[in-house]
Amino acid sequence: MAETDIRAGSGITALRVTAAALFAGFNLVPLYGLVAWHWDAFQLLLLYWGETAILFVCTLAHIACIPPAQLGTMVVNGKSVPASRLMMVGFFAVHGGLFLAGHLFFLCVLFSGAKLAHIGGVAGFVHTFFIASGAWAPLLLVALAGALDVLTGPYHPAFIDAFARVLHVALARPKDAVPGQAVGSVVGGLYVRVIIMQVALIFGAFAATVVGSAAPLVILVVLKTAVDFVIRLSAISGAPPAPLWSGVQPTLRG
């Protein structure tokens, strides 16, 4: 039983490390884009905006997996009511969606120059800056890594627990937090990371524009890659043990 427990724990940890490696791979692709594809500051900022959008969707998925008892309360029509998953996901979908829209508008106003003059609407924008530019490839890595994060996170979909029970393994969840604290830990980490990273990247883009060189962007990409990887590995090493043996004896059928 202990051997099965260790194998399951190693498997979960391996998936989490794989997610961290995929994020690192995403962060390194812009270096190739800057050198080989001649990406400019605007293209790089749009790429990282796309990363933020994907991580935001993954955050909504994390919230949808938090037990209702840990969601806390919300004020509806002046009354405090127990929050539901649908309420929380809906609230942060609107809040985060407005944030992403405002952020994109800000980037376009400051860094697009004349690039948007002949784009031809939203479809042309997506095709030019996310398909034809090659940005879709690193963003695919982010989507895969985000999916692994959701599946192996402390609050994961119910079918993961069902699959674990088939293997006679119970996945450990974090200790019950103060109602509302679980949501704060999931959402707060994303917003803090996004604000710090995006401010640094925007200043780097300004510097690259002023000096007329991609060197500041290259330095920022390398630093972002290192910081992201260290943060994710630290989170993995500090996570509670993933599997706990359920105590259910497997039944052999002849």
Name every feature range the model reports, one short phrase each.
Residues 7-21, 183-192:
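Short, amphipathic, aromatic/basic-enriched membrane-interface segments that mark the entry/exit
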Residues 30, 44-55, 139-142, 214-226:
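Hydrophobic core segments of alpha-helical transmembrane domains in multi-pass membrane proteins
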Residues 68-83, 154-189, 243, 247:
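Juxtamembrane inter-helical linkers in multi-pass membrane proteins
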Residues 101-176:
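Membrane-proximal helix-loop-helix units in multi-pass membrane proteins
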Residues 234-254:
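Short, highly charged, low-complexity non-transmembrane loops/tails of multi-pass membrane proteins
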